[in-house]
């Protein structure tokens, strides 16, 4: 079913996927796929790296097209692969992306002249704290619960 609905397919060359959409390099990185795959297909690259191809393609197609063409594609996802992807995304946002945005804000505003600059930084820092809090909750609670579900060992009194 995926072949008919999605933009990217297992038989596509990985290089074509990247050439078409450079932002998918981040998705590759979060799945542990590195460059140097030559002329191999998406399926071949995933198999070489022990990555669930269907899950990789669902994420890639979601990033490229959003929810618009995802009907029925989530039934065969690898939940462990998806959780690992989300963990890597958290690391990227918390350790790289958000600090880089803050540095750019500091470069762009003059903190010595007015209170507006200070308020912008304060607002961004509060936003970063909320994002960190949310992602830490997912790491410590949600992902732990998902792992327990996968092992048929879910706590009976837990709700997300």
Regions inferred by a protein language model and the residue ranges of each:
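Small-residue-biased structural context
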Residues: 1-160
